[in-house]
Amino acid sequence: MAKTTGIAPGMLRGVHHIALNVQDMQASCHFYGTVLGLHRLVGDEVPSTLVKLVAEGKVTNFKTPDGTILDLFWEPELSPPDPNPEKSFTRADHLAFDIAPDQMKSAIALLKQADIPFKGPITRPTGQGIYFKDPDGFTIEVRCDPQC
């Protein structure tokens, strides 16, 4: 079998969500909701898999105009960001790409063929994901909905 270079073109359906760990949820909600004007998800808009965490105040969800979800995860024990902008990337958690549930096994096989180390699949209430690093060390998630 020929070695592939990664996940096949067209397999990724788009960015599913962006997750950020935040130290001050109130300040972050003000920034993303008021300053940037993103729509805060409330009530039935909150993904069913996150309702409990939202109710507990541990997660707040916003939606960008193109439909991408921004998840803010409250992590009050985070150390302050480095004042040097070139060193402050550690507060971003991961970038998640959505795939169809029937493509998870293929994505895993392609990562193995490309010799890309990964963790998973990990099943959570929000779905199933595999995690690996990009060349700069950012965590990338390829995920599908809970039925995968």
Give, region by region, the residue ranges found by the protein language model:
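Short consensus segments that form the blades of beta-propeller domains
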Residues: 9, 51-52, 86
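A short, acidic/glycine-rich surface segment
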Residues: 2-5, 45-50, 77-83, 118
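Vicinal oxygen chelate
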Residues: 1-11, 15-23, 58-65, 82-148
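Core segments of cupin and vicinal oxygen chelate
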Residues: 21-69
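Conserved beta-strand in the GNAT
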Residues: 70-73, 141
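Acetyl-CoA-dependent GNAT
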Residues: 74-79, 145
